[in-house]
């Protein structure tokens, strides 16, 4: 069971630390204080994960069992790589038998058992390169992609929703029957067309907000389980 970390008793670092750097802007100092005092950040360091985001995936899996039996996984917006770490472990991926492909336009340090593509997912060549990298039909596509924020809520929401839509269409194109799709989204409404498309192609579609997401964050996750196969998509087009 993925439990919430207990403050300060496992990492050797107490919570409630203050940053005493008068040269830093107040906003930067507040961000750094929140980061170093975040129990999930401390737990990620203790357990060897590259980011606290690992616990979001583990928490979602604890309830929805999307990692169970996964043989090949594609990780979109993967940097710095904590989801890919989990994916490599559950699939048994090794450098000699790659079963996890990860993509991000940001540079990522290499991970055992993960084929990393430093490439914008919106690049037209990305889908083919990902399929080649993962070495077969994936049964899970996970996306933690979010557009760089502008400070304008509506603009940020629309840009991230576009990434969700592109990722969803990619998942429908590549998943094996029975596969799952998980993507980050923002509170503020999921586009009606996207939900309709997912419900047409998957047996269950739900919104999830794991406890490890910061309370003040507008992020949520959209989970589509049980891909019906490309036959379902074809039947919808004919109707």
UniProtKB/Swiss-Prot annotation:
Signal peptide: none annotated. InterPro entries: RNA_methyltr_RlmE, RNA_MeTrfase_FtsJ_dom, rRNA-MeTfrase_E, SAM-dependent_MTases_sf. It is an enzyme of class 2 (transferase). S-adenosyl-L-methionine binds at residues 81, 83, 104, 120, 144. The keyword Metal-binding does not apply. Residues 11-20 have a biased composition (Basic residues). The active site is at 184 (proton acceptor). Its EC number is 2.1.1.166. Residues 1-20 are annotated as: Disordered. Disulfide bonds: none annotated. It is found in: Cytoplasm. SUPFAM superfamilies: S-adenosyl-L-methionine-dependent methyltransferases. The keyword Methyltransferase applies. Keywords: Cytoplasm, Methyltransferase, rRNA processing, S-adenosyl-L-methionine, Transferase. One of its GO terms (cellular component) is cytoplasm. Coiled coil: none annotated. It catalyses: uridine(2552) in 23S rRNA + S-adenosyl-L-methionine = 2'-O-methyluridine(2552) in 23S rRNA + S-adenosyl-L-homocysteine + H(+). Gene3D superfamilies: Vaccinia Virus protein VP39. Its main location: cytoplasm. Specifically methylates the uridine in position 2552 of 23S rRNA at the 2'-O position of the ribose in the fully assembled 50S ribosomal subunit. Belongs to the class I-like SAM-binding methyltransferase superfamily. RNA methyltransferase RlmE family. PANTHER family: RIBOSOMAL RNA METHYLTRANSFERASE (PTHR10920), RRNA METHYLTRANSFERASE 2, MITOCHONDRIAL (PTHR10920:SF18). This is Ribosomal RNA large subunit methyltransferase E. The gene is rlmE.
């Amino acid at each position: 069971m993925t439990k919430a970390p207990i403050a300060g008793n496992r990492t050797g670092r107490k919570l409630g630390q203050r940053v005493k750097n008068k040269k830093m802007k107040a906003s930067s100092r507040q961000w750094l204080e929140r980061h170093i005092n975040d129990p999930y950040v401390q737990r990620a360091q203790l357990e060897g994960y590259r980011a606290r985001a690992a616990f979001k995936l583990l928490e979602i899996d604890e309830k929805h069992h999307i990692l169970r039996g996964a043989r090949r996984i594609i990780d979109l917006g993967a940097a710095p790589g904590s989801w890919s770490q989990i994916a490599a472990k559950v699939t048994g991926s090794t450098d000699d038998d790659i079963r996890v492909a990860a993509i991000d336009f940001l540079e990522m340090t290499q991970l055992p058992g993960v084929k990393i593509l430093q490439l914008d997912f919106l690049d037209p060549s990305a889908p083919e390169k990902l399929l080649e990298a993962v070495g077969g039909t994936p049964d899970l596509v996970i996306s933690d992609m979010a557009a760089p924020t502008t400070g304008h809520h509506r603009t940020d929401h629309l840009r991230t929703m576009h990434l969700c839509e592109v990722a969803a269409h990619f998942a429908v194109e590549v998943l094996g029957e029975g596969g799952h799709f998980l993507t980050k989204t923002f509170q503020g409404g999921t586009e009606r067309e996207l939900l309709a498309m997912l419900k047409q192609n998957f047996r269950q579609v739900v919104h999830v907000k794991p406890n490890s997401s910061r309370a003040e964050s507008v992020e949520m996750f959209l989970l589509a389980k049980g891909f019906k196969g490309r036959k379902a998509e074809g039947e919808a087009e004919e109707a």
